[in-house]
Amino acid sequence: MLIKRFKMKLGTKILCLVFVVILLFSASVGTVMLKEITESMKQMATEKAKGDLALSSTYIDDVMSGDWQVKNNKLYKGQTQINGNEDIVDLLGEKTGDTITIFQGDTRVATNVMKNGERAVGTQASSEVIAAVLKKGKRFYGQADVAGSSYQTAYMPLKDQNGNIIGMLYTGANQSILASLTQSLFTQFAIVLVIVIMVSVILVLVFTRKINKRLNALKSAFESAGNGDMTIEVSDKTGDELSELSVYYNKMRMKLNDTIQTVQQSALQLASASQQLSAGAEETNQASEKITEAVQQIANGAQDQITRIENSESSLKQASADIRDISANTAAIADKGQLAQSKADIGQKEIANVQAQMDAIHQSIQKSGEIIHQLDGRSKQIEQILSVITQIADQTNLLALNAAIEAARAGEQGKGFAVVADEVRKLAEESQQSAGQISKLIIEIQKDMNRSARSVEHVKTEAAEGVTMIQRTRDAFKEIAAATGEISAEISDLSASVTNISASAHQINDSFAANTADIKESTKNTRQAAALTEEQFAAMEEITAASETLSQLAEELTGIISQFKMINQAENG
């Protein structure tokens, strides 16, 4: 109860924490600052006392000429008596704002320090000051007790003309001034502290309000998720830890949503499978009953089968003998088929040789035709040459005639030339006659070559037809050889098959005997199977009961999962 009563929210905790931290920090800073300020003020007061001491000493030297001296047990400055001289100390006190005292030895003889409402004349300085100033001849600066009050003081020794210390000059600032100044600073610090605390509280409130808003969004999302609603998504893009927490929540939400949907689908599948299992078990029970009846029928029919097998065994032996005869006949047919295939192969080779010879004859005829064609061309060339020779002979005869005429004109000088021209004419005439005879022979040769060309063409046609017929004959022999080979192969396969059938028949005959024993054993096993089937029927009844229980569990799981609101359901809604 106490824990619940003092339970605070996160914003209140942060506010209290910030408040405590500010207070501790302010207290620490205030303490250090107060100490530093106090020390600084004391230092400033001491420095002021130093300056005022020098000012007072200089002022006294200015207004009072002469050395310090003691006459008639009185302290003098020059000719001015210091004992009871209140004017000088009051004047210096007004100028400096300090307390001023002039000592004769260690005793105050002139001072503006008040004690119990009177000037503290006749009182002594503190032992610390006496030891430092009067005995050691040094100046003293610092805090000292003055007539029962604490001051920041400055002391200097007063010496006569011989250098003997005969007294002291003192200036001091009262600590009450420091106390009031310190109190004023502390008051200002407290005011600033209160302002800082108020501003901090406001900033913390604004900050915690924003955080509370973001935390409330997360809280609402987690609360909805706890109640089964997975549709709420938290969007926080500030980039801090709460933003990361939002991202992790969204990832968790999606993962949990997928997991629950998977479980839901699995539960539905489980329910469906359990129903199918129950239905299958029921069908199996029915099938088991039918199997029991069938097994019993099989057992009853096994004996009848044994009787039929024994009757078939004698028939199988006769079939085996017939198969052996078929195997022998098939082997003889296979030998004849191989012989026919051998003859077909020989005929195919002979046809191939004849075709090769016909191809050679056909090629020779083609070459003869080409040669005759070439001779016809050559005879035409010779005919052209003879024509040229005839033309040359005609021209030569004409030239010889002209030469004879010219020789006759020349008389005796042309007789020799006339003889030569006559011989040339004779040669030209003989050339013409020879060319005519050759032309006749060439015409006869051309006629013979034309007849030969026609004969060669006819022979070529006949040879081509012979090659075609031989090719057809060769193709026919190939088909005969192939068919004979196929028949031989089929006969060989048939022979092998018959041999295998014969062997199988022997095996079947042997197997019938073994099967008879196996069927007897099977009958025994069938009766045992009937008993096992009854046991299986009882087991299937147990499976049916278990599947019904599984179906109930699946329905309960589906009901539990239906309490969750999925993301896909919200989108479809």
From Swiss-Prot:
Localization annotation: Cell membrane
Ranges of the Cytoplasmic topological domain: 1-13, 208-573
Ranges for domain Methyl-accepting transducer: 280-544
GO molecular function: transmembrane signaling receptor activity
Chain positions found as Glutamate methyl ester (Gln): Q276
Domain of life per record: Bacteria
Domain (HAMP) ranges: 209-261
Assigned keywords, A-Z: Cell membrane, Chemotaxis, Membrane, Methylation, Transducer, Transmembrane, Transmembrane helix
One Gene Ontology term, aspect cellular component: plasma membrane
SMART domains: HAMP, MA
Matches recorded under InterPro entries: Chemotax_Me-accpt_rcpt (IPR004090), HAMP_dom (IPR003660), MCPsignal_dom (IPR004089), sCache_3 (IPR033463), Sensor-like_sf (IPR029151)
UniProt-listed Pfam families: HAMP, MCPsignal, sCache_3_3
Transmembrane stretches, start-end: 14-34, 189-207
Ranges per topology, Extracellular: 35-188
GO biological process annotation, one example: signal transduction
Record flagged with keyword Transmembrane helix: yes
Residue(s) carrying Glutamate methyl ester (Glu): E535, E542
Main location, first listed in the record: membrane
Membrane topology according to the record: Multi-pass membrane protein
Family named by the database record: Belongs to the methyl-accepting chemotaxis (MCP) protein family.
Protein name listed in UniProt: Methyl-accepting chemotaxis protein TlpC
Lineage: Bacteria, Bacillati, Bacillota, Bacilli, Bacillales
